């Protein structure tokens, strides 16, 4: 028998990385929020790798921070090693990665949730979504507790009817031995959502005391220590070392000899696996000519002996895991503390969602995280933040926050999922962002913090800090307009940097465009130049070195911006439009894109179809441009 237990503005189902950001955004925007969690000991659980960030994922964390989210601050407080990746490549792909103490990370996030004034955290299972008159009205929990609300955000991760596989054994449970959610899938089906089965996995954890690190390569953290949050000051702490080792022919022999015992290859698992984080057995089958695969050995925290074997995700039987691991250099006597496993779970087709991550057919229902078909903590947190903001704006009857592909990686993520969908766990990559030179991790605050300010997630103090940084950059750019004569001192400096000499006066800004010249070099020449913070100096140098490419991308955005501004009504009758191909009519009717730009990215919709749509819209004489009050992000320009 159900019993009524309270009314909330917004209810968040799940307290993983998506649920945490969604609940905090909702509460901080003034909405009375309830966050339901299957187990309070699993808040922000790092069930797989003990790390935040990485290639493209670090960009997402910086954007979450710039909009007022929590992940970056939590990673900065709980890291045990920080490394900037891809420094040998261009600035667009520089990505920060933190090895974190996963238990401290969980506790830190739980404390933040518990301390938020408008937020109630409760251990219970959301089992049913209540819909009345076509709108969200509340939820019912598995024990019969009923809550009313105006919006629900589903962030259940990999827990919906999850199934763990280790060799021939299959167990109905969630990650790390936690309980799974059994009822919500049925409720989602009744609401009309198409559910699929996806699969991911995790490697074994081994005891630090059983490893011989002298046979492995050391991987040290960066000094000075970088940070994710734009609020974090300079950090000084002793960092832990990670290690690198490799598989070998014997490792491969043992795994391949037991391939039929892997549920992925025995036919036991039919769910779609992740392409970009394959199991070790999948790697050996897909890349048979590769002699070895690298493995990173990573500590899971400061107060545990558990070491994470990155690159060795597996669902092989326990005995095969033990035998194959002991063939690795330094692992001859290794002891497994937790076995690797595969997990399959229910997820929705994300093309049922709008760019806000709200359901197209049910106002007030939002989805975020792995339930949407994505993979990764950072992708989940980014979706959680976006869904939380838009749920709060929905409850307030305010325009939504729509991040475009030219605004943020979060915009690319939302657009890819809602427009293209995915047939396998979706992972963010820099190659997915066509404007990645503009969407660098270093300028996330300059791109997004003013948007966060408008949603109410950015404090006065933080906004003032951003304004000071902008003025610092502007003052430096004005100073770089000055011209210096071709003195001996200048040419000696250029020679020392392997740059050609000058014979006439030259602008300081022009000098800075040279590959080997940095702002500190110019300070030596012109002591009157304003000194800059590291963050401002980085912006000045990147703008100088990549200025031509940046302008080309901005011009590309300006050319295509018109399509993004042309709205398509949600009830637009595509079937009645003569000239649209049958496939285009079917795809557009099913997807109901928000604008012409989104329509153009749907598989099966051709440029000719877009031209037909543009003509039809003009004939209808409808207002096709975003107005100032139709999207929070509209007057934001890069």
Regions found by a protein language model. Give the residues of each.
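Conserved beta-strand-loop-beta-strand element in the redox core of flavoprotein oxidoreductases
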Residues: 130-146
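Conserved N-terminal/central alpha/beta ligand/cofactor-binding core
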Residues: 7, 24-128, 143, 155-172, ...
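A glycine-rich dinucleotide-binding beta-alpha-beta segment and adjacent secondary-structure elements
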Residues: 308-374, 402-415, 533-587, 592
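An anion/pyrophosphate-binding glycine-rich loop and adjacent beta-alpha core
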Residues: 39-41, 185-322, 330, 410, ...
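Beta1/beta-strand and adjacent pyrophosphate-binding region of the FAD-binding site
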Residues: 4-18
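Short hydrophobic core segments
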Residues: 13, 146-157
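Internal hydrophobic alpha-helix adjacent to the cofactor/substrate pocket in enzyme cavities
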Residues: 380-401
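Extended, charge-enriched "interface" segments that sit outside catalytic cores
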Residues: 432, 449-611, 615-631, 636-638
